[in-house]
Every structure is written in C-alpha cells, then in structure tokens.
C-alpha cells in the first residue's frame, strides 16, 4: 500500500515539474513576443538585415540559419548596408550589432564594452557545471596569471614543450617509412592536449592521465553544445532548464570528475607549502594561479580554472595548427621551404626560445593560414554595460551585444589576391621599413583580428604561437605528409566560430630529419 502511494506521489511530483516547466516556457514565450513587438528597438536606426517573420517570434529559424551560415549572413549584411556601416543580425547568441573592421580601433579599449559580460550571457556561466566559464569572467585571475607569470616563464618552457611534442609524436604517428592514413585533426588535438598539460600541470603525473586528457578535450565541445541548447531561454531560467537537459548533466559530471582528479594535487601542494620553510620553484599554471590568487586575495576553484585553461587554449590552438597543416598540404612546395628554414635556424638541434622568433617564414605561413580561415568570423565580442557614443556618432545602448567582422582579412584593398595562399605575404610586409614587428603572428591590428585587438586581445596568443611553431618543427622534419583525398578541407560554421574540417584524412610516414630535435 505504502509502495503504491510512494509511486503515485513520485508520478505526481514528476507531472507537477513538467506542468511548471510548461507554464514557465509559455510565460517566457509571451514575454518575448511582447518584448519583440511592443516597443521600439533602441537601435532602430541601425538596419536589421536578418528580419524574422511574425511567426518566428522566438527567432529560432533566424538563429539556426546564422548558426549554419554565419559567414554568408555577415557578407550579405555588408552588401546591403555598405562596407563601412554597422548593422544588426539575429545570431545564434541573440541579436548582435555587427561593426565594420574600421571601428575595431575605436572600441578596442572602451571599459564599458565588456568582454566578460558578453561571455557570461552567451556561455550560460550561471548554470551549475559551467563554472569554468564563470572563472574566466568573474575575476582577472586568468589574465593576470598569463600576463605576469606565464609570459615571464616563456623562455624556460621551449625545451620541455619540445620534449613533450617529441614524445607525443612517437605515440601518435608511425615510426616506419610506410604510408599510414590518419584523421589529422584528431591526432593534432591529442598532441595539443598533451602539450598544453605541460604548461597547466607541470611535472604532475596527472598530466598524462587518460581521464584528465579526455575531459580537457571533451568539456569544451560538450559545454558548447549545452550552452547552445540553453541560450534561447532567459538567463534566470537556464539553471532550471539545465536540470532536464542531458547535455548539461553530462557537463556537470565532467566537472565533478575534474574536481576529483585535481583537488588532491592542490591539497597536497598546499600542505607541502604550509609545512616547508623553503620555496620550491614550479613552472606550471597550478603554482602560478595559487601565487596570483594569494597576492590579489582572489578565491577560485582550481578544477574549474584548469578547465577554463583548456577552454581557452586546447581547441583554439588545435584549430590554428590544423588550419596551417591543411594549407601546407594543399601547397606541398611549402613543406621543404619550411624544413630548410628550421634546419638553418636550429642547426644544432636545440630548439630555443630565440629560435622561434627567427622562424620568420613559418611565422608568415601560420599567419597567412589564420588570415584565410580565422577561428571566428566575428571577433572583439562585447556587451555594453552603459550607453556608449562612438566617434562616428553611433550610439550603443546599454545591454547591446556587439562584435567586429573579420572580413578585412579577405579585403583585396588590404591584402592583394586575398583568396590566394601566399606563404611569403607577411615576410614581405615585415621587410618594409618600420614594419618588422607590425605583421608578426602575435601582433593584432584592425586588418587582422583573429586574436582580438586592444585590451581584451587574447593574452595566451604568445603561448599558442610558440606551441604551433614547436609542433610544426617536429611534424614537418620527422614526417612526410600528403592529403589522402582530392576533397579539399572545408571550414565548418558553428555560429561565429569557423571550425577547421574535423574529417580530413591524410597519409603520413616517418622520414630522416635534417636535424635531430
């Protein structure tokens, strides 16, 4: 009798939850309709180029179209309003104001245009399981650590990074002279995950823990999917909706697993530090984060912050390396040119920090690949925290989401023959008087904003550039490569993200290196 009663009560509770959810959703839809059609838009003078139909009152159709065709939507927008004019779109992240590249310099250092607030809104940082996004936006800890600790340690990291790539290559690629077919991006993701763990976790054994490496690769993708599913709902509803969303539950489980792996390491280190009278120098993010947090009095979650680092570094660096390899393999004459440069610069086989700077052709090749296929079609994303007036007279109301189009990278007025891969393009630009440092891979400017521009430019771009160069030195000198299909790699649009093709297969075999790295 009691068993049946419990079952009935459980069923009633379940039904009640569903009824409450449906009621909230209906109320939210009504609120969105009233909001959409009941008042004048504060940016009504700026054209909306992706008008939604009356029946698409949630904007789902417009959002889905942008998610799949963002680059085309942006191109059509500028075709309608003119290359130097802003416009509005319905993106997969809601309505956005799209600025032309010419305005990148004007907004680069405006404090009231907040990158953190944009990320909080679009990444569902307030939802349990998404704490790594909250860690990246709630404090300056990550940026401070990168700028003060990581940057000063860069010159010491080249050798351990090179050693890590050498070991990873032996594990991931063949050591015989027979051709082997592999899915390139999968292998490079494994390589960068292992390489990044050298910086993140130092000499800790968990840096090679298969479970940890799996989480660092999967959390980014799974949380991206979950946030995409949650984003259409109002922010106050997202934590509630996440309870019923399998993808959000998966993300929460990954964070718990990460905490179980990282927490014992943090506790051991803190105990050792408390018991010791001497300071042990460690060159890894665990130590640097602890130091900066203590200096600035910042409380943080070590596990969430390690996943924040993975979010910030692993997939974006993998994408840059993959994009560069695709361009090199489509222009195989570039391979020997790069090998010759590496052999010339690293004659003794010792890859040093200064060696990376002197690989100027390689720097140009990477930047050219990034120019052709940046990781974002809209960059410098911000949310206005107060009303802003730009020098051109444009008023940006508080609460506006905005970003700058990356299309200057393909502008023939800026880059002649922009559709052509030119490995020496940036070598020549750097040879112009006074332009030596202006066109380096890590330098940002309105014409190329792949790393952002201004005060929110990617602080980790110097590490990413070094990692890609170190990886290319090993990959090109130690192996022969060729595309195994006549099908050329095609960038895939996921909203404002331009993802390098994850399906491309290549043939690889071992070769005799010009120098022993």
From Swiss-Prot:
UniProt keyword list: Glycoprotein, Heme, Iron, Membrane, Metal-binding, Monooxygenase, Oxidoreductase, Transmembrane, Transmembrane helix
Pathway assigned in UniProt: Secondary metabolite biosynthesis
Residues reported in the UniProt entry to bind heme: 458
Listed GO biological process terms: mycotoxin biosynthetic process
Glycosylation site list: 8
Coiled coil: none
Species of the source: Penicillium decumbens
UniProt-recorded name of the protein: Cytochrome P450 monooxygenase calE
Family membership: Belongs to the cytochrome P450 family.
Induction summary: Expression is induced in complex medium (Czapek yeast autolysate medium) supporting calbistrin production.
A Gene Ontology cellular-component term: membrane
A Pfam family per the record: p450
Membrane topology type: Single-pass membrane protein
Membrane-spanning segments: 14-34
Name of encoding gene: calE
Function: Cytochrome P450 monooxygenase; part of the gene cluster that mediates the biosynthesis of calbistrin A and related compounds. Calbistrin A is a secondary metabolite with an interesting structure that was recently found to have bioactivity against leukemia cells. It consists of two polyketides linked by an ester bond: a bicyclic decalin containing polyketide and a linear 12 carbon dioic acid structure. The polyketide synthase calA is probably responsible for forming the decalin moiety.
The keyword Heme is annotated on this UniProt entry: yes
GO terms for MF: heme binding; iron ion binding; monooxygenase activity; oxidoreductase activity, acting on paired donors, with incorporation or reduction of molecular oxygen
Named cofactor requirement(s): heme
Enzyme Commission number(s) of this protein: 1.-.-.-
Cell compartment(s), UniProt: Membrane
Use in biotech settings: Calbistrin A has been reported to possess a number of interesting bioactivities including antifungal active against Candida albicans and cytotoxic toward both healthy and leukemic human cells.
């Amino acid at each position: 009798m009691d068993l049946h009663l419990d079952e009935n009560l459980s069923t009633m509770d379940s039904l009640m939850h569903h009824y409450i959810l449906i009621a909230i959703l209906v109320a939210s839809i009504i609120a969105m309709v009233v909001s959409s059609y009941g008042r004048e838009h504060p940016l009504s003078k700026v054209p909306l180029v992706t008008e939604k139909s009356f029946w698409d009152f949630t904007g789902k159709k417009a959002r889905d179209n942008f998610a799949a065709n963002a680059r085309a939507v942006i191109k059509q927008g500028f075709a309608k309003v003119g290359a130097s004019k802003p416009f509005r779109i319905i993106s997969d992240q809601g309505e956005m104001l799209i600025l032309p590249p010419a305005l990148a310099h004007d907004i680069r250092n405006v404090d009231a245009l907040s990158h953190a607030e944009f990320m909080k809104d679009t990444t569902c940082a307030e939802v349990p399981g998404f704490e790594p996004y909250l860690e990246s936006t709630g404090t300056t800890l990550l940026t401070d650590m990168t700028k003060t600790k990581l940057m000063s340690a860069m010159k010491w990291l080249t050798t351990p990074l090179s050693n890590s790539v050498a070991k990873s290559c032996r594990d991931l690629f063949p050591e015989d002279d027979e051709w082997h077919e592999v899915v390139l991006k999968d292998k490079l993701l494994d390589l960068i995950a292992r390489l990044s763990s050298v910086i993140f976790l130092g000499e800790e054994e968990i840096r090679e823990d298969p479970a940890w490496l799996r989480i660092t690769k999967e959390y980014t993708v799974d949380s991206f999917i979950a946030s995409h599913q949650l984003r259409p709902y109002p922010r106050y509803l997202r934590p509630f909706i996440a309870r019923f969303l399998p993808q959000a539950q998966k993300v929460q489980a990954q964070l718990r697993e990460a905490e179980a792996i990282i927490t014992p390491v943090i506790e051991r280190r803190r105990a050792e530090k408390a018991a010791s009278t001497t300071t042990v120098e460690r060159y890894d993010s665990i130590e640097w984060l602890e130091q900066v947090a203590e200096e600035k009095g910042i409380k943080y979650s070590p596990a969430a912050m390690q996943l924040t680092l993975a979010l910030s570094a692993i997939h974006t660096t993998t994408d840059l390396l993959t994009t560069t390899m695709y361009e090199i393999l489509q222009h195989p004459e570039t391979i020997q040119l790069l090998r010759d440069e590496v052999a010339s610069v690293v004659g003794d086989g010792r890859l040093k920090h200064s060696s990376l700077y002197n690989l100027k052709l390689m720097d140009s090749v990477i930047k050219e690949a990034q120019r052709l296929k940046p990781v974002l079609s809209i960059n410098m994303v911000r949310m206005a925290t107060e009303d802003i007036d730009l020098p051109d007279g444009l008023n940006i109301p508080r609460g506006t989401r905005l970003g700058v189009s990356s299309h200057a990278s393909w502008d023939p007025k800026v880059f002649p023959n922009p559709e052509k891969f030119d490995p020496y393009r940036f070598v020549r630009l750097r040879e112009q008087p006074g332009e030596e440092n202006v066109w380096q891979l890590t330098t940002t400017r309105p014409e190329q904003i792949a790393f952002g521009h201004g005060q929110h430019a990617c602080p980790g771009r110097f590490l990413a550039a070094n990692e890609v160069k170190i990886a290319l030195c090993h990959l090109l000198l130690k192996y022969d490569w060729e595309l195994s299909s006549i099908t050329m790699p095609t960038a895939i649009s996921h909203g404002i993200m331009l993802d390098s093709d994850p399906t491309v297969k290549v043939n690889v075999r071992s070769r005799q290196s010009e120098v022993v790295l």
